[in-house]
Regions:
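A surface-exposed regulatory interaction patch that couples sensing to output
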Residues: 50-65
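Short, surface-exposed beta-strand/strand-loop-strand elements in extracellular ectodomains
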Residues: 280-287
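Aromatic (Trp/Tyr) and acidic
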Residues: 16-37, 66-104, 115-273, 282
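C-terminal beta-rich recognition modules with glycine/proline-rich loops and embedded aromatic residues
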Residues: 92, 156-165, 170-261, 285, ...
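Asp-box/WD-like beta-propeller blade repeats and closely related beta-sheet repeat scaffolds
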Residues: 1-16
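Short, surface-exposed beta-strand/beta-hairpin micro-motifs centered on an aromatic residue
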Residues: 299-301
Length: 421
């Protein structure tokens, strides 16, 4: 009750800063308890300057602080789920599509120095301070809400892209430390937190990210169960007495396999995501190929009576493609399936404590000088129509080479060295 005596002017002044997702937390408390005080508090943190333009379906993002917006829209999504406020749903969907279509880099991340910028100048913002991790963390959260409403496979496509290219590569595999930004500056490198001196916002969300890999693999409704991600896992659908075990080495391999355990024969539909990045998918049930009539960017629906021991195999061919920036066709990311590839560029000029943050400097992740050597080669010559001709895959790992001697690997797998996307 303490905020109630405050004037509307004071309320608006108080919430002008970045307060994160506290209103979402109050909506969740309202859902748990039914106490209207929590709903009132959630609505009290409604940020007019952020949400009102979105209610009008207007992109007024300008150069504002990116992560000030996203958690507040997540709260609106939660509001819709609890109150069926259609305005909250429409603005949430509008914001998501605006972000993905106009404000997102190839790895699925957004922002430059934490802020929006003119989407018509995206190629001019490939800096060492792109891709704040908190932004992607919250976009994935918003995506989970929207997918539950729509079942739209494009949402799952984005989720996979951001999960593999940004989140998976955000953590240093040697120390467990995490990165604030995902630098897209040619010749830069990832800059990690330290064990005792860094506690940025992206450390908090960064560690939470890596406990969430199981959150968005499977979804279900009255029609059936949806397989959105190709990650080794097991899910049990208690109401159906059905357990599905997924085994795969994706993305190192193109095939994923499912084994079903059924207490009793059960008729339902299993929806396998048909990603937009693949074509000519091959699916078999118990060793027999089935006809795939769906197109990429949808779901392959398999409806039948499932029995204990049934098996499904799905192979998703991956191709080398280019993802060009909207404002400059000569700047593009090299893609392999959903993965953004990057070229190794060694460690020249990297001096300790790099690639870790310098605790002696204030917010050095935000002012860091990457000291990119002037002679470092930052481009790759290839045929735009046939980029696959420039690369040769080496062995079973996701490693490619070029005639110029470049070594190219997934961006998520490049650590402790410079790279070029």
């Amino acid at each position: 009750n303490k905020p109630k005596p405050l004037t509307e002017e004071t309320r608006k002044l108080m919430i002008r800063n970045e307060f994160g997702g506290i209103n979402e937390s109050f909506y969740n408390l309202y859902a748990i308890t039914g106490d209207e005080r929590y709903r009132w508090l959630a609505e009290y943190f409604y940020h007019n300057d952020v949400i009102d333009p979105l209610k009008e379906l207007r992109d007024d993002l300008g150069t504002k602080h990116t992560n000030t917006f996203i958690p507040k829209v997540v709260a609106e999504a939660r509001n819709y789920e609890l109150t069926r406020n259609e305005t909250s749903r429409k603005l949430s969907e509008f914001f998501w599509h605006t972000m993905i279509d106009h404000h997102t880099f190839a790895p699925g991340c957004s922002s430059d120095k934490e802020h929006y910028f003119d989407p018509k100048k995206l190629s001019q913002h490939l800096t060492g301070y792109t891709g704040e991790t908190c932004c992607t963390y919250n976009m994935l959260k918003l995506s989970r809400h929207l997918f539950c409403w729509t079942g739209d496979s494009s949402i799952a496509d984005y989720y996979e892209r951001a999960l593999y290219n940004h989140i998976l590569g955000q953590q240093d595999p040697e120390t467990g430390m995490v990165a604030y930004f995902l630098p897209l500056l040619s010749g830069s490198h990832k800059l990690y937190s330290t064990k005792e001196n860094s506690f940025w916002c992206c450390v908090g969300s960064g560690f939470e990210n890596h406990a969430k890999y199981g959150e968005a693999i499977y979804y279900h409704n009255d029609r059936g169960i949806y397989v959105n991600l190709f990650i080794p896992s097991q899910v049990t659908w208690k109401e159906k007495g059905l357990t599905i075990r997924q085994e795969t080495e994706f993305p190192q391999e193109e095939t994923t396999r499912f084994t079903l355990q059924a207490e009793n024969p059960v008729r339902t539909t299993i929806y396998l995501r048909y990603p937009s990045w693949s074509k000519d998918v091959k699916v078999s049930v118990n060793g027999k190929k089935i006809s795939v009539k769906q197109k990429s960017g949808s779901y392959i629906a398999i409806t039948r009576e499932w029995k204990d021991g049934d098996q499904i195999s799905a192979t998703y061919p991956m191709q080398i493609k280019l993802g060009t920036t909207p404002d400059n066709p000569d700047k593009a990311a090299l893609l392999y399936g959903p993965l953004v590839l990057a070229g190794e560029r060694g460690t020249e000029g990297m001096q300790a404590p790099a690639p870790f943050s310098n605790p002696a400097l204030y917010n050095d992740y935000y002012t860091y000088n990457f000291h990119v050597p002037a002679h470092l080669r930052t481009s790759l010559k290839l045929d735009k129509k046939h980029p696959e001709r420039a690369l040769q895959r080496v062995g079973s790992d996701l490693k490619f080479t070029t005639e110029q001697g470049d070594v190219i690997r997934p961006l998520y797998d490049l650590h402790h060295q410079r790279y070029v996307v």
